[in-house]
Amino acid sequence: MSKIGIIVAMEEELESILDIMDNIEEKEIYGLTFKTGQIEKNKIIVVKCGVGKVNAARVTQILIDTFNVKCVINVGAAGALSPLLNLGDIVIGEKLIQHDFDITAFDHDKGYITGVGDYIYSDIELIEKFKKAANNLKEKDYKIKTGIIATGDIFCTDIEMKNKIFSKFDADCVEMEGAAIAQVCYLDNIPFIVIRSISDSPNGNNEIDFDKFVELASKRCANILREFLK
């Protein structure tokens, strides 16, 4: 039985995971609620970290230190940057970058982190398994893309900002946790992957799109996760 840590940022994302879990129990650590249970034959520990990079990094280290997870999966919603993505499409993060990390004053590219580099790569085996799981699903009214996910402590509603991130990093979507989780896992040598479903469009009304589609995005990620864990 594999022991897998799953991180989400919001309540809608958490509920979608709990809907597919069995034998759920709770453990409180530092004011955070970790839910343990099973999906298929896998032991699962899922936690809602809250929004942002520090919150995400914090729970990642707790999952590794306290629960001894063998891999970490981050699922949830993201905003599209690529014009090729539509609401509900899935992005499997091949590599991640912190678009707001800036030490360009020291002659490094934006996004470069000392001791880490710029792009952090997800585990190749996990990528291939998630691609297979996504393609096994009967629903085909959405695209599945392996690509680049950008992370920053900004909820991007400004079209100009989104275009700059897309242009600079060639990122497919943007969110607020994934690359922080990736950095902790990279430093701790723990396999990880980030899966995002598009909840707002690159040129639409992001706040309206997000509120309307976040539940759909969360359920779609949960369905792919369940297929992956079979």
Predicted regions and their residues:
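Glycine-rich phosphate- or other oxyanion-binding loops that anchor nucleotides, phosphorylated ligands
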Residues: 2-3, 27-230
